[in-house]
Regions:
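Pocket-lining segment of extracytoplasmic ligand-binding domains
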Residues: 87-88, 161, 166-255
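Short, glycine-/small- and polar/acidic-enriched structural segments
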Residues: 31-155, 159-162, 171, 178-184, ...
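Sec/Tat signal peptide C-region and signal peptidase I cleavage site
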Residues: 25-30
Length: 324
């Protein structure tokens, strides 16, 4: 009888252990990191984390096509860290979602493109024209800011047409639109193919500047595993620095995502791999949040002190300095 009871106890204990393992989030598994990002040249850094973590650690990168899906996977516990646009991070935080931005991912990477030989030489020439855009994105904000600075109303002076980023080039080449504002490599591709030309790079230092995307973790991950967050942020910083110092390697690897290297070389000057954040970065994030609320994209401002944690990049800065 005692033997039967002992066997039963062992089986129950084993079942409990198995249940804990199966229900564990990635962060609970020591040395195993799950990261989400896009397959673009400007968001490539996570694919290099494995080169900059300790030998016992492993990194699995999951590609996504949009920031919302990455963030949802993060909140569900399927990812330890993910990329997102700064605009989406603000939107998520304004809704009370427990996300924390712990590093930048990329800056710049956007451009306003017009049809080649269409006689559009200044933003003011877009009056009465059709412009492709994706609502609710960073690019919509940049487009509206660019139009406003040239005295144009997005409501009355131009026609904004909702077009997916992947379809903008075709629409421009066919004459269905006169311009579009999107992220790289689509502007460079329009130039490479000969149907478009760059009208403007929509970066305004006294306002939003050139911020674009960052890396998110959950508040719970920061609280329970700060040392793992630091590992990832430092790996991100080292990967970003390595790629910036080796542009040929960066663009060659990025071309495997489906864009010709010649196009990426045209786009390279407009793409900035990033990791560091400082007070100026936070000020630009706040400015972006104000623009989003003015446009009705968010109802209230998030708590920026809770959204952005500078401590991890500050430590990474020290570690990278020590590397030199």
């Amino acid at each position: 009888m005692r033997s039967d009871s002992l066997i039963k106890a062992v089986i129950i204990a084993a079942g409990l252990v198995l249940g804990l393992v199966l229900s564990a989030t990635p962060s609970a598994l020591a040395g195993q990191f799950s990261i989400g990002t896009w397959k673009t040249a400007q968001t490539i850094a996570p694919f290099y984390y494995a080169d900059f973590v300790s030998g016992e650690d492993s990194v699995t990168v999951y590609p996504f096509t949009n920031p919302a899906d990455q963030k949802n996977a993060l909140l569900a516990g399927s990812l330890d860290m993910c990329g997102t646009t700064v605009a989406h991070a603000i939107h998520s935080a304004s809704m009370g979602q427990p996300v924390v931005m712990v590093a930048a991912l990329c800056n710049k990477s956007s451009a306003l493109v017009v049809r080649k030989d269409a006689g559009i030489e200044a933003v003011s020439d877009l009056k009465g024209k059709r412009i492709g855009y994706v609502p609710g994105t960073m690019h919509e904000i940049l487009l509206r800011e660019t139009l406003s600075r040239s005295g144009l109303s997005a409501q009355t002076d131009v026609s904004l047409l909702r077009i997916d980023f992947f379809d903008m080039g075709l629409a421009l080449s066919r004459g269905n639109i006169d311009a579009f504002l999107s992220g790289e490599p689509f502007p460079a591709l329009a130039v490479e193919k000969g149907y478009g030309e760059i009208l403007a790079y929509p970066y305004y230092k006294e306002a939003v500047g050139d911020i674009n995307a960052g890396m998110l973790v959950t508040r719970d991950f920061v609280k329970k595993h700060p040392e793992k967050v630091q590992q990832l942020v430092t790996a991100h910083a080292r990967a970003s620095r390595h790629l910036a110092r080796h542009p040929d390697q960066w663009l060659t690897r990025a071309s495997a995502f489906g864009t010709q290297k010649s196009v990426l070389e045209k786009a390279a000057a407009n793409m900035e791999l990033a990791w560091d954040m400082d007070a100026a970065f936070v000020s630009r994030v706040r400015a972006l949040g104000q623009r989003m609320q003015a446009l009705g994209m968010i109802r209230r401002q998030p708590d920026y002190n809770a959204l952005i944690d500078l401590s991890f990049v500050q430590q990474a800065r020290k570690e990278l300095t020590a590397d030199e």
